[in-house]
Amino acid sequence: MTSLSRPCVEFISTILQTVLNLGLLCLGLILVVFLGKETVHLADVLFAPEQTSKYELVEGLVVYFLYFEFIALIVKYFQSGFHFPLRYFVYIGITAIVRLIIVDHKSPLDVLIYSAAILLLVITLWLCNSKRLKRE
């Protein structure tokens, strides 16, 4: 088996990084469109003449923040030299579980398990922000 030369490896790495960057750029643009659609939907729910469920409004707000967090994650990826900070994934996980609790809160045991998962993610976030693991 022959090993690739250093310039060849760097060329392949550059091409793959460019493909990844273009894919994330497209994903970011798609998320901006969905964020705009969610803004319009929230305005419709908020200003609807009929009585709407408060859960629907809160669920829409949490989905809005999920879109926002994913867009912020992509922006941070480009700002930090093509690397994803771990804590942004933890933020997204916490927000997603909060949304799940709002949408599906029928079983008290499930809510307790989801809450324990949030506690675990908050502890993870605390550890990530400690001096030993902090990179930024």
Curated annotation (Swiss-Prot):
Keywords, in A-Z order: Cell inner membrane, Cell membrane, Membrane, Transmembrane, Transmembrane helix
GO cellular component, one term: plasma membrane
Bilayer-crossing regions: 15-35, 55-75, 82-102, 108-128
GO biological process, one term: cellular response to phosphate starvation
Membrane topology of this protein: Multi-pass membrane protein
Subcellular location: Cell inner membrane
Name recorded for this polypeptide: Protein PsiE
The species this protein was found in: Escherichia coli O17:K52:H18 (strain UMN026 / ExPEC)
UniProt gene name: psiE
